[in-house]
Regions:
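Conserved "HGTGT" condensation-loop signature of ketosynthase/thiolase-family condensing enzymes
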Residues: 1-137, 141-180
Length: 180
């Protein structure tokens, strides 16, 4: 059985730099990230468990959104008119969020990003359950990070475990947790 070990969210409009300085403060690469990556990074920091920064092949990172990297794609498109910015280009793929989280935390399990037409708890739960079918995955950091602009976003994440403490990871509990 999969369980929700912990949950974190960041309300839309939150000053992400102030949040970073208050809660993390020791990862200068944060300032190069696009909004979606900053959100994913901060959610992962809130959900991180001990021990930190040790290789873990049993931890998957799965992120979902409707916007993908659209917010940063717009910034990159604007930069092309002057001079294309390599520092923006790297963030024009939705899976960069999972990569940033995995690199920071040394997670070596599956990393996947899914762009959906809309938030669909049934699909969310089914995809996360599928990740646990490999026999290696024991936990997953999974979330919804939808950055429509630098201050208009929806962001929440779960730490889901196989047979861990907490409530069952299913559609009903997903709805209940997100809508608290």
């Amino acid at each position: 059985m999969l369980t929700i070990r912990s949950f974190a969210s960041i309300p839309g409009g939150t000053d992400l730099t102030a949040l970073y300085r208050a809660e993390v403060g020791d990862y200068p690469k944060f300032f190069k990230m696009d909004t979606a990556c900053k959100l994913g990074f901060l959610l992962a920091e809130r959900l991180a468990d001990e021990p930190r920064f040790m290789p873990r092949e049993d931890r998957a990172v799965l992120m979902f959104s409707t916007c993908g990297s659209l917010c940063n794609d717009r910034h990159y498109e604007e930069s092309v008119w002057e001079f294309p910015s390599p520092s923006l280009f790297v963030y024009t793929l939705p899976n960069i969020i999972t990569g940033e989280i995995a690199i920071r935390n040394k997670y070596e399990g599956e990393t996947s990003a899914y762009v959906l037409e809309r938030f669909d708890p049934g699909t969310f739960v089914a995809v996360v359950e599928q990740a646990f079918q490999d026999g290696v995955t024991g936990s997953a950091l999974c979330g919804w990070v939808d950055a429509r602009s630098d201050d208009d976003f929806t962001a929440f994440a779960f730490l889901v475990e196989r047979n861990g403490p907490g409530q069952a990871f299913n559609v009903e509990n997903l709805y209940g947790t997100v809508n608290q």
